[in-house]
Every structure is written in structure tokens, then in C-alpha cells.
Amino acid sequence: MQFSTTPTLEGQPIVEYCGVVTGEAILGANIFRDFFAGIRDIVGGRSGAYEKELRKAREIAFKELGEQAKALGADAVVGIDIDYETVGKDASMLMVSVSGTAVKTRR
């Protein structure tokens, strides 16, 4: 499965548009990790814990996106948009959502 943020794939003509596909992942934030991430942010370092959670959520969302596309018989997803939002009480959770158009290409 190929993923692209562009509307086309160079050298691979799109022969069929299969439909819009999406993937979402919502992960809760840990209060202790939040506390230490806040301290690290104060002293100017990067928050490895948050970066790891973002990466994990993005991987889950893309896996869902690919599974939906495959179920439609597609071999690629183009025009992908990636969004990040905080949700829940006191913005205690992180949501990553991805969407795009599932397509069949001529290879």
C-alpha cells in the first residue's frame, strides 16, 4: 500500500477512485509523563515521551487507513491529510486522524 499527500503518484496513473478512507487513533496522556514533559519543556529539551506517543498514534491511524483502502480493493491512498487534536476533559487525550482517497493504479 502506498501513501501520498499529493493527489497523484508520479509514474503510476490512477485507473479507479475507490472512495474516501479514514483512520483515527486516540491515546490518553499519563499524568506523570505530563509532569516530567512539562519540566523538560521548561528547560528547553524535547519531550521524548510525547514524541513516542505521537508516533504511535500516527502509526495506528495509518494502519486503519490502509486496512480500509485494502478492503475497497485499492493499492494506494492519495491526497492524505493528517490532523492532530486534543480531546476529552481538560484536553487529556490526543487524537490523530488521517484521511485520503483510496485509488487503484496502473503499475
Swiss-Prot record:
InterPro entries reported in the protein's UniProt record = UPF0145_dom_sf (IPR035439), UPF0145_YbjQ-like (IPR002765)
Gene3D superfamilies reported in the protein's UniProt record: Hypothetical protein apc22750. Chain B
- Name the domain of life this protein comes from: Bacteria
| Transmembrane annotation, as ranges | none
Family according to the record: Belongs to the UPF0145 family.
NCBIfam families, per database record: PRK02877.1 (NF002776)
* Protein's name in the database: UPF0145 protein Ent638_1382
